[in-house]
């Protein structure tokens, strides 16, 4: 059975503005069903959505049993006002508002909390993020509150300091995880945090002509080196494509190939352990 631990049903892999516009009035069942059919045909039995504020992931969860798929969603991902994430998530101005938004997601049937606590990679410049991560104490409080409310936490997080803070708070999964150092890898391992590296968002950019090839190759190589180190430590890894992101179509199988390049012959055993942890936590 194939699994994808990070998708966005609201997006289509081509035009994020157009994709969101498609569902802005209400989730479009025809699109969602076609996408679920694709996953079913490819043998996917478990999907974990990264969330959206228009209810598309929520509707996909309702329809997924028709296709024999276990579907998990946070409903709306939560981000700090004025920082990365507001294009798809609900911005929050205070921790009090954060608690309110968690409550609203709970009423909508959320399975877990998704927080966005850093910027994203600049695919033209190796080592550069679009913005720094949130302060460590704030990250720790966001994770603590969600756990206190009974939810596991999925965190969009890049950069070593951001991931260290999240892992110290025992975040349940880290998504992306670009530019980590040994301290960050050890912190995730010790916390039992599952790393979902979404290599497809990098590897699928090669040869497209949109970004600097040298930078893309360097970013991918860095991520794969860190994955190998994390696996050697006994860290938990799970496959997630970030399907719906540009050049990452729904049903993409590239993640398994890219993880295999990094992890070698142990890839299946390593991913089985990580997937078991994801399904237990989420």
Task: Place the predicted regions along the sequence by residue.
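Divalent metal-dependent hydrolysis catalytic cores, especially in the metallo-beta-lactamase
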Residues: 29-58, 68-78, 110-124, 152, ...
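Metal-associated gating/positioning segment near the N- to mid-region
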Residues: 2-63, 84
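Glycine-rich anion/phosphate-binding loops
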Residues: 52, 90-100
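Histidine/acidic residue-rich metal-binding segments in metalloenzymes
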Residues: 96-116, 122-195, 216-237, 269
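Acidic/histidine-rich helix-loop elements
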Residues: 10-26, 81-92, 124-132, 206-215
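His/Asp/Glu-enriched, well-ordered alpha-helical/loop segment
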Residues: 148, 220-282
